[in-house]
Amino acid sequence: MFIIKTFNMLNASSKFAICGLPLRVDSYKTCAFGCEYCFANNRKIMEFGKSLQIGNITSVRKRLERIFHGSGAKDGNLIDNLIASGITWHCGGMSDPFQPCEEKYGISARLMELTKEFGISVLFSTKSDTIYDANPDRELHTFQMSVTCLEPNALEPNVPTPESRYEFYRSLKDAGYRVGIRMQPFIPFVTDERIVELYCDADHFTIEGLKLVPQNREHVQRVLEMTGIPKGAFTQMGLLNLRPEIRYELYKPIVRELEYYAIPYSIADNDMHHLSRSKCCCGDALIAKSSGFDNTAMCYEHGREYTLDDVKQCLGCIGECKANQLFTSNRQEGCVTVRDFYEKRFDRKSSPFSPKFLCEFDHIPTDEWEE
């Protein structure tokens, strides 16, 4: 008898300083959509090359019952304290929650039912055109659809057609659900402002440029050949990112359209968080609560010159939570708690949550005369 393995589906992200939704939940360890540009696939984060594994819902339930009906959140436990604080969960950051295997296993549907029971809000990110038999709650469950192009593209070999995904979007909106659009990755010569025109009643837009995994040379070469982008257009910032001056020019027509339709938006590139118009890069309209101490929130509240003291005032008990387990031993630098990591790395120009990391551009012009 073949037994499907399970895995711990609820985790705290090591990107807690740059992401307002550091509680990450994934239903599956695989992704059938097979997007060529997927960094999770090409960094082997979710073990995509191995057999399908499904999220362990039972372990999530036990944790929630302990936190809300038992002994409470454990002191110093980052996941426990993030949950207890009421932060929205993000489902689908590493693998799609509504890929075809959802029809058989229904892990995402079960997650919806469990979070309804405990009153937990969840943002689901997907490229799918269906949620199968899932029954989301309009108040607790929101959606973020990833849209890179409006024509079928070899970069997304197994993704449903753009037409069917728009019909899915339309059905969610017409049923009263909040839905955002994530233009990620934003690919030169592929992604353009027509996406804004089509999804002009979206609750939020997030823009984030194409990123490549430098250690995976085969992946880099394949994507460069498929997109026609020269390698010189990229600069290394951990991953290979399009140069900020290139992204700045590419985003201008998108931002103009977003301003025209009065759609709130965020720039999710780490060096451009200060250009966002929302406190959370996934969209304030799509969440119940973000952490509030990430750098997008700091830029929104204090401007690009926010200080370490500004961050510390928002940390609360999270600052004393253990976070070293989120990093490999060679990246811990003796730090143990969330507060330790901030104090050690905040002033480094290479640190994505430092104001020194932000690009030189202060805003994106929305009118021709501003240029």
Regions inferred by a protein language model and the residue ranges of each:
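Alpha-helix termini
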Residues: 45-47, 189, 275
